[in-house]
């Protein structure tokens, strides 16, 4: 299975450039075109958070306008720049999010691999953290018998990357 990952798109309302100089909308449009034209075909796309730069609902709508051009199905999880409330509103029509509660989590078995999208965000904090409730959900999900390989995707790395300014924002309890 060919799977593509998009992350940290940092889309802003009104298609504004991020950080005063980065045209994230054009970059995402280019990525979508590349994925659609890639051969052999990409079978699914995972988007691992920081979809927006400031969490605004309008920015999520701009993201949707662009990402809806993807040919393969796509799956999203939030990052620390995303408002959970606006995330849920923007993606309420996504069937795989229908059972999410206070955090965004789901398992999709529609592909040759099982995809588990997992929310590691802490509202208004740069780092990630796994609550007991989230860990229990993940344990139960992983305990379900399947013959498929499982791919877990989330925003925060569960280990140090060696990039100092990023490692202070990683998953605090990633060893769990």
Predicted regions and their residues:
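Extended active-site neighborhood of metal-dependent phosphoesterases/phosphodiesterases
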Residues: 57-144, 149, 171-176
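Class I (Rossmann-like) S-adenosyl-L-methionine-dependent methyltransferase catalytic domain
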Residues: 12, 19, 94-95, 160
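Active-site glycine-centered loops adjacent to acidic/histidine catalytic or metal-binding residues
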Residues: 8, 49-50, 79, 118, ...
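Surface-exposed cleft-lining segments at the edges of enzyme active sites
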Residues: 17, 51, 121-132, 159-168
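Short, solvent-exposed loop/turn segments at secondary-structure junctions
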Residues: 9-11, 82-83, 121-123, 157-159
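Short acidic, glycine-rich surface-loop motifs adjacent to enzyme active sites
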Residues: 145-162
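N-terminal active-site segment of His-dependent metallophosphoesterases
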Residues: 1-62
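Hydrophobic beta-strand anchors of alpha/beta hydrolase catalytic cores
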Residues: 3, 45, 115, 150-151
């Amino acid at each position: 299975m060919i799977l593509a990952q998009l992350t940290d798109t940092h889309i802003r309302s009104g298609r504004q450039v991020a950080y005063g100089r980065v045209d994230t909308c054009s970059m995402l449009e280019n990525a979508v075109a590349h994925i659609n034209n890639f051969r052999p075909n990409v079978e699914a796309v995972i988007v691992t958070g920081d979809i927006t730069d400031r969490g605004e609902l309008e920015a999520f709508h701009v993201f949707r306008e662009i990402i809806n051009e993807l040919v393969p199905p796509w799956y999203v999880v939030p990052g620390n720049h995303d408002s959970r409330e606006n995330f849920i509103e923007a993606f309420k029509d996504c069937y795989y999010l229908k059972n999410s509660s206070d955090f965004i989590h789901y398992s999709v078995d529609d592909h040759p691999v099982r995809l588990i999208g997992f929310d590691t965000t802490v509202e208004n904090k740069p780092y990630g953290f796994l609550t007991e409730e989230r860990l229990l959900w993940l344990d139960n999900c992983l305990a379900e018998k399947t013959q498929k390989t499982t791919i877990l995707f989330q925003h925060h790395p569960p280990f140090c990357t060696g990039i100092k300014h990023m490692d202070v924002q990683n998953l605090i309890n990633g060893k769990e």
